[in-house]
């Protein structure tokens, strides 16, 4: 299934993402935020889905240590794959100031067609094979420690996305091939970044942020929608 060019559904109709009524004790709950008088939005935690119009869908993971395994009902893995693999097949760790990525096999794992028996450092362009699933690891931006895992062949995540972004310091959306998410259009860039355990964004041109016009950036939440003349995206809970 190719999602390129498809416009994703609006992410404001599910009460688990954008709430029309407050949860219990919302005044004392730091995980919720009143964006307007009518909507209460839930703070981003460790994972989210990003739908970028006319580009695709992405599973974005924020933690430094992630589990990879088979997608099953009730599965607790961070990166669930629809493939013939173990329920907990491998661990992926981000370490050090340089943002080294280490994969630890919990079941048979191949890197560049060579089976690994111990934690192994990943390099830009490495192909990782886990059972019937194949992923390509890339560090697209030289000044960011965030990375990508691109699905090869019939490999799929659940829910379906085009790639996994391993977000460390920043996630850059733009028309440069070194960006983490690339759109093919005129020059424009939106950067997502973490600050004080909050997910924020900044844009090099004004955007509509959750219905607020002419914004240059702000905090993002589950259910947030960001729209500019060239880039539009929405965020959803990854469950």
What are these regions (language model features)?
Residues 1-65:
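Hydrophobic, helix-prone linear segments
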Residues 9-12, 21, 30, 34, ...:
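Intrinsically disordered, low-complexity, compositionally biased regions/tails
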Residues 16, 159-161:
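Serine/threonine-rich intrinsically disordered cytosolic regulatory regions enriched
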Residues 17-21, 47, 105-106, 111-153, ...:
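C-terminal boundary/linker segments immediately following FHA domains
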Residues 30, 50, 142, 149-151, ...:
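Generic hydrophobic, helix-prone segments enriched in Leu/Val/Ile
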Residues 34-45, 93-98, 138-147, 195-196, ...:
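Short, surface-exposed loop and linker segments with low hydrophobicity and enrichment for Pro/Ser/Thr
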Residues 52-54, 152-159:
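Short, solvent-exposed loop/edge segments of extracellular or virion-exposed proteins
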Residues 61-124, 162-230:
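Forkhead-associated
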């Amino acid at each position: 299934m190719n999602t390129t060019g498809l416009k994703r559904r609006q992410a404001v109709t599910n009460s688990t993402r954008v709430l029309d009524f407050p949860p219990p004790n919302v005044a004392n709950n730091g995980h919720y935020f009143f964006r307007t008088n009518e909507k209460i939005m839930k703070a981003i935690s460790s994972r989210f889905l990003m739908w970028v119009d006319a580009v695709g869908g992405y599973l974005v993971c924020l933690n430094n240590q992630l589990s990879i395994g088979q997608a099953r009902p009730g599965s607790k893995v961070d990166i669930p794959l629809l493939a013939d693999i173990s329920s907990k097949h491998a661990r992926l760790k981000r370490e050090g100031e340089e943002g080294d990525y280490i994969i630890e096999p919990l079941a048979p794992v191949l890197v560049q067609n060579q089976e690994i028996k111990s934690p192994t450092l990943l390099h830009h362009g490495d192909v990782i094979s886990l059972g019937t699933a194949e992923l390509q690891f890339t560090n697209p931006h030289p000044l960011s420690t965030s990375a990508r895992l691109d699905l090869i062949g019939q490999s799929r995540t659940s829910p379906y996305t085009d790639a996994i972004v391993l977000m460390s310091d920043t996630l850059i959306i733009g028309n440069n091939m070194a960006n983490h998410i690339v759109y093919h259009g005129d020059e424009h860039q939106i950067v997502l970044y973490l600050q004080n355990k909050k997910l924020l964004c900044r844009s090099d041109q004004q955007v509509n942020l959750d219905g607020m016009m002419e914004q240059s950036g702000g905090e993002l939440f589950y259910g947030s929608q960001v729209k500019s003349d060239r880039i539009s995206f929405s965020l959803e809970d990854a469950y």
